Amino acid sequence: NIKDNIAPKGYFIGCCYDGNKIFEALKDSNIEFSDTHSEKIYSIDKKYDIDDFTFNPDNMDNIFGNTIDVYMESIGQIIPEYLVNFKFFRHYMEENGFKLVSPKVKGKYSNLLKQNNITEGFGDFEKVINNLPELAEQDKELQKGGYYNEAMNILKNTELNDDGTIKELGYEKLRLLSSFNNYFIFQKV
């Protein structure tokens, strides 16, 4: 559909979970995060039954139909989603006349698209999160008093009292959820 509906030199931009990261994380168990009142914030449950999610262009039986059930408290219901193998995705897009691009952005948002936030051509939210202190040095909006200063809270870890109870809940599980995401910019050639 996008092959027919995007003009030459037009863009296809998006964001979704990196299926390989989710696949690896779900090898041991499903993922769930609840707050200090035992209210579920999110969960990701494995619904597929494959042992390997490696992309092989000669045999793609393991690439399609790998469902996960995703619950987000803010949405209030379970939504089925599918694992996206980014090596397959790139291969498929290139076969259909698209190439991954990293636009040359100047000014305010240029730091987000720096090479140290990109993995194999895809924007990597995990790297953006890990690079937030560096980004904040250059972006006043991330600094104290800035419009996006609260985004820096995602770097806080849980603090415990001496008896091991939670003093202040950190953002490790939200950081994990965010780190599963990749963003991409394809241009039709």
Label the predicted regions.
Residues 25-28:
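Polar, enzyme-active/binding microenvironments
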Residues 17-19, 105-106:
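An acidic- and aromatic-residue-enriched active-site/binding cleft used to recognize and process polar
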Residues 22:
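Glycine/Thr-rich phosphate-binding loops of Rossmann-like dinucleotide-binding domains
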Residues 1-9:
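A short glycine-rich, Lys/Arg-flanked "PGG" loop and its adjoining helix->strand segment in the class I
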Residues 8-17:
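Conserved beta-strand signature within the Rossmann-like core of class I S-adenosyl-L-methionine
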Residues 31-189:
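C-terminal lobe and adjacent flexible extensions of AdoMet/dcAdoMet transferase-like proteins
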